[in-house]
Each structure stands twice: as structure tokens, then as C-alpha cells.
């Protein structure tokens, strides 16, 4: 079940990425903080799953956001480390699933990631 959710989420990321960067006339431009947070979410998903397709797609998305972002490279490294801390948290599910997507979404919306992003955005 978790793999299906991850694949569904990864496919959504691909669709968003292709719509944003796929040669269309309209391209999405994010703020530096949004690029970092998008990177953090993608990186968390890549670190959380073992499925080759999910890991490859999420890693490609993370790398794309890092390349397009303008914050110091250290911001992206720190975000990845912080994401791994969220993945290590114990989430209980009634079905016994690891709830990786839930952890990554909670990470994306966390105060910790917001603080990290603002710290590096204020250095610019």
C-alpha cells in the first residue's frame, strides 16, 4: 500500500515537473525558500523508499530543485539531514505501515524546515 502511495505521489511530482519544465510556454517559478522546501520533500521521499523507480524519480526531482534554487548548497545538505531525522521518527499506523509519505509531508510543513529555509534565505 505504501509503495502504491509513493508511486502515485512520485507520478504527481513527475507531472508537476514536466508541466513546469517540459518546454511549455508557462514555467513555474518558485521563491528560494520554495525551491528548498520542494527539494527537501523530494529528498525525503528518495531517502524513505527502497523502490528503485521511486528513489530515482524523487532523486531527480530533488536534484532539479537544487539546481534551480539559489540558496547556498549547505542549505540543501542540511535539509536532507533534517529530512532523515523526520524519517527516523516513530509513527504508528493501525495497519503496520511505515507512513513514509506522512513523515515527509509533516517534514515539509515543519517549523524546523521553515527555520532552516529562513536562516539561509536571510544570508542572501
Describe each PLM feature range.
Residues 1-9:
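Bacterial N-terminal signal peptides that target proteins for export
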Residues 6, 31-32, 72:
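Hydrophobic alpha-helical segments and their boundary regions
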Residues 8-17:
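Bacterial N-terminal signal peptides
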Residues 20-62:
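N-terminal secretory signal peptides
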Residues 54, 58-124:
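Compact alpha-helical subdomains of small soluble proteins
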